[in-house]
Amino acid sequence: IAQCLVGSEMCIRDRCSSYVLEYLSNYFDITVFYYNPNIFPESEYTKRILEQQMLIGEMKGKHPISFVAGNYDREKFYELAKGLEHLKEGGERCFKCYALRLEETARMAKEAEFDYFTTTLTISPMKNAEKLNTIGAKIGEKYGVKYLQSDFKKKNGYKRSIELSNEFGLYRQDYCGCEFSVRDRKQESTGIKKK
């Protein structure tokens, strides 16, 4: 993998995954594309974007890491979630949300002539890497930009992300980001079951 990827440029759809940046910056010039219209409330969105920018400013990789913020298109997220609000995290609503964000990343990668695009979401034990990779590959074909398949949580990737978060003093959220995951977390913490 290193031989064919060195020196390439990559666009990453990110939510502050330190390990992914540490690892991929050995092989790519990286642009972190922060596109997360699902995040709720707006103060949480702002908090996460500032954390991402701080990390990029402090983290030194073998190759450059830059940052681009996408639009905070909350209405797009609510359009895709319509009728799926009742579903728990990890279901069809999430898959549509992955596709929305990966589609925007691929569009941006195509427009800026990146060699690859990927997502950091596979670092999370709560995310289905196989589903993310299937969605990413399909969108990559549509846009003519290679999708870098991954499961960053493996080979101690998730463990390393926690170590780096502690090292850099990063904020680690306890929910995915959307209003519905906030609701689910509150219900779990109070023991209330959804009907």
Which residue stretches match the model-derived regions?
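Nucleotide-activated chemistry modules centered on ATP-dependent adenylation/adenylyltransferase
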Residues: 8-9, 13-195
